[in-house]
Amino acid sequence: MPGVRQIDPLLNVLRDTITGMVRRNGPDLSARQFAVFLICYLESGPHTVRGLASRLAVSRPVVTRLMDRMEELDLARRVPDPRDRRSVLIDRTSPGDELLTDIVSLVGDASRHPMHASDAVVRLRGRE
């Protein structure tokens, strides 16, 4: 396939990062949960269920279920919107900040050393 070779390095980084996340026995996030996590942690907020639903092109009940799981994992929490009591805001948590730090390390390691993301996992496990 033309053009696939140009993408291979990025796919390798993605593969190695996800493999590293699985090996470190971190939270098991679906693609949608991971998307919500990254939006909330990498983009300035405030974030709302309505806004996330719009951004992901899914219904609000879908985002509500995603948030239920994120709260179970202590990766995010819903807090009342002080400006609109009918709405909630999505807030970050310390465990979520730690997970983001781990992901950044795994991505960096996978970028610098393709196929060696497991080295980052060993390093991260030493911090636990």
Question: What do these predicted ranges mean?
Answer:
Residues P46-V88:
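Canonical helix-turn-helix DNA-binding module
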Residues D16, A35-L38, R65-E71:
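Generic structural signal for well-ordered, non-membrane alpha-helices
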Residues P82-I103:
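Basic, amphipathic "hinge/linker" alpha-helix immediately C-terminal to the N-terminal HTH DNA-binding motif
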Residues R32, R60, R112-H116:
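Surface-exposed, interaction-prone regions with an acidic/low-complexity signature
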